[in-house]
Amino acid sequence: MKTITACDLGIEVTDALGVFRWLLASFLMGKRIRSAVAVEAYRILVDQKGLDTPLKLARTSHSTLIRLLGQVGYARYDQSTARRLLGLSKKVEAELDAQLDALREASNAEGFKRWLLSFEGVGPKTVEIFMREGLGQLTMLHGH
């Protein structure tokens, strides 16, 4: 199976918005669901519905997210995934800039990983997917 990259999804992890989009994609791909379903969910949420910022996603109703996730096959996971996506978007909106500043100042990849793991529904697999591309791009972004 082909590894999905940020580039495959049209994501440039060069700023906070790109970090959010890649985190969203990594979150979806980190679930026990086929990667094609996760990619389709990302495309519907971001490309079709324009939920491409933490604030836009946070302002989406739980029932709307359940419906959108259900369209692509998250039937077993739609309730919990929708709830966790709302939590993720709110926490990213509140904390991402500070986390990026801390990463830039201290080059603290482990601290950034711990922050990612603090999200409900984010486990080692999601962090692995995110860090595969996210860390390299972030360190280049911050000149380290």
Features from the language model and the residues they span:
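Catalytic DNA-binding helix-loop module of base-excision-repair DNA glycosylases/AP lyases
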Residues: 28, 107-144
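Structural motif
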Residues: 10-21, 32-33, 75-80
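Short Gly/aromatic-enriched secondary-structure transition segments
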Residues: 41-45
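Short helix-capping/linker segments at secondary-structure and domain boundaries
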Residues: 30-40, 92-98, 136-139
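A generic alpha-helix surface/boundary motif
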Residues: 22, 39-40, 110
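Intrinsically disordered, low-complexity, charged terminal extensions of DNA damage-control enzymes
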Residues: 1-9
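Short, hydrophobic/amphipathic alpha-helical patches that form generic packing surfaces
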Residues: 22-31, 87
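Alpha-helical ds-nucleic-acid-binding substructure associated with the helix-hairpin-helix region
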Residues: 48-120, 132
